[in-house]
Amino acid sequence: MSLEQHYSSILTQLGEDVNREGLLDTPKRAAKAMKYLCRGYQQSLEEVVNGALFSSDNSEMVLVKDIELYSLCEHHLLPFIGKAHVAYIPNGKVLGLSKVARIVDMYARRLQIQENMSRQIAEAVQQVTGALGVAVVIQAQHMCMMMRGVEKQNSSMVTSVMLGEFRDNAATRSEFLSLIR
C-alpha cells in the first residue's frame, strides 16, 4: 500500500469523504508533504557536508545561531518549530558556514524527539570537524503540547548538549551561553 493510499484510508477512517472536492488530491499532497518533511532519512552526513571542510589556524569559537528548524515529533507526528544554536572550537579545520545549518536540517527532517536531535547534531559536527568542543542548544515549541494534551500555548522546550571544551571548561561554556542570549 502506498503512502497516498494510507492517507486516503486515514481520511476515510476519520469519517471523511475522500471524493469530495476539497479532498480529491489531499492524499497525494499529504504523501508528498510527508516525504518532504522526512527527507533527512534520504541524506547522509557526507552528502550534506560535501567536502566543505577547510584548513584553518583559528582556535576560537565558531557559532552559528538562530538556525530555524522544523521537525515532526515521533510520538504524535505533529510539528515542533524552533531555533538551534551550534558552536564548535576548531582543531585545524572549519566547516563551510551553510553546512552547519544543513546538518541541523538533516536531523530535523526526520521523525524526532528534540533531546535526541540535539545530541545527533553535536556528534555530527564533532565527527566531521574533529573539533575540540561542540555545543548545541535548541529551543522549540511543540504542537503536540500546544494543540492537544495539556494545550500550553506559551511553553517551549530547551535542550543542550555540550561536548569537549564546552563541557569541561566553564569559561568556554559561559561565553557560548552569553552569545546566544
Curated annotation (Swiss-Prot):
GO annotation (BP), single: tetrahydrobiopterin biosynthetic process
GO molecular function, a single term: zinc ion binding
Keywords from the UniProt entry: GTP-binding, Hydrolase, Nucleotide-binding, One-carbon metabolism
GO annotation, cellular component aspect: cytoplasm
Annotated InterPro entries: GTP-CH-I_C/QueF, GTP-CH-I_N, GTP_CycHdrlase_I, GTP_CycHdrlase_I_CS, GTP_CycHdrlase_I_dom
Pathway: Cofactor biosynthesis; 7,8-dihydroneopterin triphosphate biosynthesis; 7,8-dihydroneopterin triphosphate from GTP: step 1/1
EC number: 3.5.4.16
Cited Pfam families: GTP_cyclohydroI (PF01227)
Annotated TM spans: none
Chemical reaction(s) catalysed: GTP + H2O = 7,8-dihydroneopterin 3'-triphosphate + formate + H(+)
Oligomer status and interactors: Homomer.
Family as reported in the entry's similarity comment: Belongs to the GTP cyclohydrolase I family.
Protein name: GTP cyclohydrolase 1 2
Gene from which the chain derives: folE2
